[in-house]
């Protein structure tokens, strides 16, 4: 069973686009960069106007791992609250006698039990939309000496294609999303990932891995005209594009591919 989503609501949400951009930048800050690139950052993120095609395959109870995650988070919050409580007692010794009456004043972790309203969807997601990621970087030329020249470049990632199975679990006011595996798709399997229309071409991964999430994409690079004919610059640009393609795929697999997931917690809205 297929259904439509109101993609325009997400696409027009600047806060969501900015949140994703910040999350990507946080990941890049913890990524070891090669010697030929520095100051790698996401300048802009746009979900685009074309949403994914989604087909509902199955409805089940949520996986136990999601409940375990909520319990672990609740236990951690309880432990932190009790630690803060102990710190405040040390600061205010006049309250020590009252607080020694018993453990009744300690914070207790809430009991997490499955609810009849909890539900999980197995979805087939196909995306060939107009999402656009704009990235800035400094290309470092280390010849004839180290850091001989630094060249600012701007790269655009577009034409992203994916076709995967994923699970979406709704537990109380929390939503979990995780990708399970890729779906065979001739349009993507036979496609090529273009790193630069005038540069090298990297063929899409074959044979099909269990999960790549991103199966095709295009990266275009803008550099100053005075550098476009220099072989060393073009080689470095090609290496940078391949590096971006790799870390972009790795980011999605580490963050979204099972046994990893993203968790959207809407409980804070009650405060």
From Swiss-Prot:
Domain spans labelled SMP-LTD: 1-267
Additional information: Present with 1070 molecules/cell in log phase SD medium.
Function: Component of the ERMES/MDM complex, which serves as a molecular tether to connect the endoplasmic reticulum and mitochondria. Components of this complex are involved in the control of mitochondrial shape and protein biogenesis, and function in nonvesicular lipid trafficking between the ER and mitochondria. MDM12 is required for the interaction of the ER-resident membrane protein MMM1 and the outer mitochondrial membrane-resident beta-barrel protein MDM10.
Membrane topology, from the record: Peripheral membrane protein
Name the record gives this protein: Mitochondrial distribution and morphology protein 12
Localization terms from the record: Mitochondrion outer membrane; Endoplasmic reticulum membrane
Family as reported in the entry's similarity comment: Belongs to the MDM12 family.
Gene: MDM12
């Amino acid at each position: 069973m297929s259904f439509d989503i109101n993609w325009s609501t997400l696409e027009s949400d600047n806060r969501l686009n900015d949140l994703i951009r910040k999350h990507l930048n946080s990941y890049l800050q913890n990524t070891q960069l090669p010697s030929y690139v520095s100051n790698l950052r996401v300048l802009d993120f746009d979900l685009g106007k074309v949403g994914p095609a989604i087909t509902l395959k199955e409805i089940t109870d949520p996986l136990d791992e999601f409940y375990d995650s909520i319990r672990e988070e609740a236990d951690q919050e309880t432990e932190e609250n009790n630690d803060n409580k102990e710190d405040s007692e040390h600061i205010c010794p006049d309250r020590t006698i009252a607080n020694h009456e018993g453990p009744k004043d300690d914070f207790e972790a809430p009991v997490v039990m499955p609810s009849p309203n909890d539900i999980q969807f197995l979805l087939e997601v196909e995306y060939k939309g107009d999402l656009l990621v704009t990235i800035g970087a400094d290309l470092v030329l280390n010849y004839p000496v180290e850091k001989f020249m630094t060249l600012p470049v701007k790269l655009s990632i577009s034409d992203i294609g994916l076709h995967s199975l994923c699970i979406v679990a709704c537990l109380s006011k929390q939503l979990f999303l995780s990708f399970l595996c890729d779906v065979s798709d001739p349009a993507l399997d036979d496609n090529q990932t273009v790193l630069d229309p005038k540069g090298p071409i990297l063929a899409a991964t074959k044979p099909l891995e269990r999960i790549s999430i991103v199966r095709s994409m295009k990266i275009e690079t803008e550099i100053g005209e005075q550098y476009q004919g220099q072989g060393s610059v073009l080689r470095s640009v090609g290496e940078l594009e391949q590096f971006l393609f790799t870390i972009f795929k790795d980011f999605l697999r580490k963050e979204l591919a099972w046994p990893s997931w993203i968790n959207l917690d809407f409980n804070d809205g009650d405060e």
